[in-house]
Amino acid sequence: MSHPWPAGAATGLGSLPGTDPAEAVRLVLGELPELPYLPELPGRGFGADLIGRTGALLVDLPVEWQPHGWTVTSHSGRDQARARDHLNRDLDAVTEQAQGVPLLKVSVCGPMTLGAALELPNLHKVLTDHGAFRDLAGSLAEGARVLLAELGSRLPGTAVVLQVDEPGLPQVLAGQVPTPSGYGTVRALPRSVATPALTSVLEAAQPGHRVVHCCAAEVPYDLLADSGASAVSVDASLISDGQLDSIGELVEAGISLWLGVFPGTDADISASAARERIGRLWSKLG
């Protein structure tokens, strides 16, 4: 499988501190020229984080912020409009500064993680209703297509990579998502429902330009491969020896492995230490 990014390229995953989109885009373009990305700035307030930005993309599926979180509603209101305003400011910043960039990555929240975050009007998670969940996945897939098309028109000649963030996927598959009351958990989502939902979103991007990021332990590598991912991004510190065979099969199938080795916190790690961590893992893979 061919990929548009060069071997050994470094990139970021999404969120940055601060509230200025122009400054954030300048930083990313300067520090990560081989695979820059459209940053998220959750410090601007609700609607600017991963869930809010993705909610702004949903097509024909209004959502509103309620005291208990984002909820599917009958009509779009000011909360979704605010999230769209944040996204438009981000798009304007990258349009102004990224002309001529050969490659750009953009992230959306994946359908399983989004389904675990959004609630229906009856205060149950979207995951509890498979019909509503399929509607959500379809709306998200269409929204991702619209976003990629807009980036294509704003940045002619730039190839756009789609990163689908699924930090909650292992919990969803294991039936470990808490109910809104906190007294129970949501029934596990069958893989027969999860896999096509993820595939539909990934297919918004061109073949070879489809990435799934899962920063949790117990990553379902086989499901990600079956979904049509071109690359899988994981936290290197959470990889166990029991997962090495699955990772090896992934790599042998031509799927790119992206290893997160620099923490997204104030903790520091040198470039040499990061290389050593990658080298140790790669030697285990044989």
Predicted regions and their residues:
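Glycine-rich anion/phosphate-binding loops
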Residues: 79-95, 134-147, 272-281
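Alpha/beta catalytic barrel-like cores
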Residues: 1-129, 223-228, 255, 284
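Structural motif
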Residues: 13-17, 42, 109, 213-217, ...
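Glycine-rich tight-turn/loop motif centered on a GG-T
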Residues: 76-80, 121-138, 174-193, 230-233, ...
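Catalytic-face loop-and-helix region of soluble metabolic enzyme cores
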Residues: 230-286
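Short loop/turn segments at strand-loop or loop-helix junctions that form parts
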Residues: 106-120, 162-169, 260-264
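Conserved beta-strand positions in the central sheet of alpha/beta enzyme cores
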Residues: 36-39, 163, 232-233, 258
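Active-site loop segments of alpha/beta catalytic cores
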Residues: 139, 143-245
